[in-house]
């Protein structure tokens, strides 16, 4: 499926896992257009990595409204991670389990944080590790996947802690 023009995003796995920035805009009509674009490209599960206290307008009710107008069933899951930080190991396992279960049901996923770079890149990196990538190949893959985005020049993930989390992911012990 084609990418929506807005929000800025990229397919991690075509027609299965899309990653990018927060889909809500300050102007409601723009927010609705963004959500419609995501629904129109097949997204049925939204994984929100932002915290409720971040200065972002919520979009869950708009999403449900847009989905109902199209007779679509969608799901919204918030797995909050502090901005520029990493999740707990258990938190990452929950995020990846949500993504995996949705894909297995045939429901394409949109995973996002605020800018679609740090927290999102961390989740994408761990997903790539779990699906067979290793070491620096993960970061090259993320860079290649993001090549068509507006924010492609910004490193993803953003912090060394996030990169280390990905590199350590396959050997991380359970909490």
What are the language-model segments listed below?
Residues 1-110, 115, 122-175:
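Cys-dependent protein tyrosine phosphatase-like superfamily
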């Amino acid at each position: 499926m084609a990418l929506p023009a807005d929000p800025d995003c990229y397919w991690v796995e075509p027609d299965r896992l899309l990653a990018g920035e927060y889909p809500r805009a300050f102007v409601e009509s723009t927010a609705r257009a963004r959500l419609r674009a995501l629904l129109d490209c097949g997204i049925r599960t939204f994984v929100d990595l932002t915290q409720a206290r971040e200065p972002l307008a919520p979009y869950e009710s708009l999403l449900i409204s847009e989905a109902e107008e199209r007779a679509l069933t969608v799901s919204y899951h918030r797995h909050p991670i502090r901005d520029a930080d990493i999740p707990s190991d258990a938190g990452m396992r929950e995020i990846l389990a949500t993504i995996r279960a949705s894909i297995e049901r045939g429901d394409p996923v949109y995973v996002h944080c605020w800018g679609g770079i740090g927290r999102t890149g961390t989740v994408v990196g761990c997903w790539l590790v779990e699906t067979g990538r290793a070491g620096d190949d993960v970061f090259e893959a993320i860079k290649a996947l993001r090549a068509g985005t507006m924010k492609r020049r910004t490193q993803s993930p953003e912090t060394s802690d996030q990169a280390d989390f990905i590199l350590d992911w396959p050997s991380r012990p359970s909490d």
